[in-house]
């Protein structure tokens, strides 16, 4: 019985530590694997992801943050969020930033 409890506890610790490695502790946000150009461009990534965060706060829809970030922000939801955040006048700047984040794909 004691061995089973220890094995269960060890398995839980391994899972918790393993999943914690998937999170960026500096920003406490999930590392987006779809954007290959994030490394070296974290400042751009933070500016673009802020649009999705603002949109999620505006609409409060479950899953909206993921839909906005889908395909490294190259989707219709990101454009909707850009308009909802009243930042559509900056669309050309965001297109350049998104192309940088999508570099290498």
From Swiss-Prot:
Gene Ontology CC: extracellular region
Keywords, in A-Z order: Disulfide bond, Hormone, Neuropeptide, Secreted, Signal
Coiled-coil residue windows: none
Tissue specificity annotation: Produced by the medulla terminalis X-organ in the eyestalks and transported to the sinus gland where it is stored and released.
Signal peptide as annotated in the record: 1-28
Main location: secreted
Disulfide-bonded cysteines: 35-72, 52-68, 55-81
One GO term (biological process): circadian rhythm
Cellular location(s): Secreted
InterPro entries xref list: Crust_neurhormone_CS (IPR018251), Crust_neurohorm (IPR031098), Crust_neurohorm_sf (IPR035957), Hyperglycemic (IPR001166), Hyperglycemic2 (IPR001262)
GO molecular function: neuropeptide hormone activity
Similarity annotation: Belongs to the arthropod CHH/MIH/GIH/VIH hormone family.
Function description: Inhibits Y-organs where molting hormone (ecdysteroid) is secreted. A molting cycle is initiated when MIH secretion diminishes or stops. Has little or no hyperglycemic activity.
Protein name: Molt-inhibiting hormone
Species of the source: Penaeus japonicus
């Amino acid at each position: 019985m004691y061995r089973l409890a220890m094995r269960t506890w060890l398995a839980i610790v391994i899972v918790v530590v393993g999943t914690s490695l998937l999170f960026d502790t500096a920003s406490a946000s999930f590392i987006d694997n779809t954007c290959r150009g994030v490394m070296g461009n974290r400042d751009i990534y933070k500016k673009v992801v802020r649009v999705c965060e603002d949109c999620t706060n505006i609409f409060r829809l479950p899953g909206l943050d993921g839909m906005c970030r889908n395909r490294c922000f190259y989707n219709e939801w990101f454009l909707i969020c850009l308009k909802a955040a009243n930042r559509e006048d900056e669309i050309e700047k965001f297109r350049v930033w998104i192309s940088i984040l999508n570099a290498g794909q």
